[in-house]
């Protein structure tokens, strides 16, 4: 029997979880072994629920709509990235209509087994001896990679934990190992610098894009 874990907040006019505190209080009242479906129909701040999901013992299904009007799938990818970085297992399922055979089959599998996996057979590592790397494009890629390792390609990252993106806290060693160290930047500082740009230069830059079809 499906039971909603939290009510719509009549004062706010929605049922979204609005803080880590609210998410923590919600999960404190949920059976820790109960199967949980996290329905995602829009972008959400994953850190409102992720810490509680890590401690939840029951199976977790991230369920999203597949509709560009309402970016639930994007929200699910963020939550999935957060849970992966926190080493918490979960299952994923999405649909455009929630009536298609693939969705029904996937939901039945999760309800029966408590987990759902998707086919990944199309993924495979590219070995150094692969024909792809011997091609012209492959050789260009090798040279670019060698250049990045030698000279570095510094990645500017605005407000690492912005919008609750735990998955935005990139592991430094992984980034440095591929020659792409992170420079942490502030959106507040960006706003200050933007205000220093004269209006005529702003308009000239905008015109540059518009004359090229943007």
Predicted regions, residues:
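An N-terminal assembly and electron-transfer interface module characteristic of large anaerobic redox
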Residues: 1-214
């Amino acid at each position: 029997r499906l039971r909603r874990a939290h009510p719509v907040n009549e004062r706010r006019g929605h049922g979204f979880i609005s803080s880590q505190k609210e998410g923590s209080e919600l999960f404190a009242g949920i059976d820790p072994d109960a199967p949980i479906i996290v329905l995602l129909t829009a972008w959400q701040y994953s850190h409102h629920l992720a810490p509680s999901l890590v401690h939840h013992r029951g199976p977790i299904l991230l369920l999203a709509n597949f509709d560009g009007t309402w970016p639930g799938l994007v929200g699910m990818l963020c939550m999935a990235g957060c849970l992966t970085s926190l080493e918490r297992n979960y299952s994923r399922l999405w649909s455009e209509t929630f009536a298609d055979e693939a969705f029904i089959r996937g939901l039945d599998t999760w309800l029966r087994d408590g987990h759902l996996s998707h086919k990944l057979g199309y993924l495979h590592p590219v070995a150094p001896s692969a024909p792809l790397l011997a091609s012209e494009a492959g050789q260009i890629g090798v040279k670019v990679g060698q250049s990045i390792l030698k000279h570095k390609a510094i990645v500017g990252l605005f407000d690492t934990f912005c919008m609750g993106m735990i998955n935005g806290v990139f592991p430094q060693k992984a980034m440095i190992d591929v020659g792409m160290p992170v420079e942490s930047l502030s959106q507040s500082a960006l706003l200050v610098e933007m205000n220093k740009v004269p209006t005529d230069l702003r308009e000239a830059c905008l015109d540059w894009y518009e004359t090229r079809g943007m």
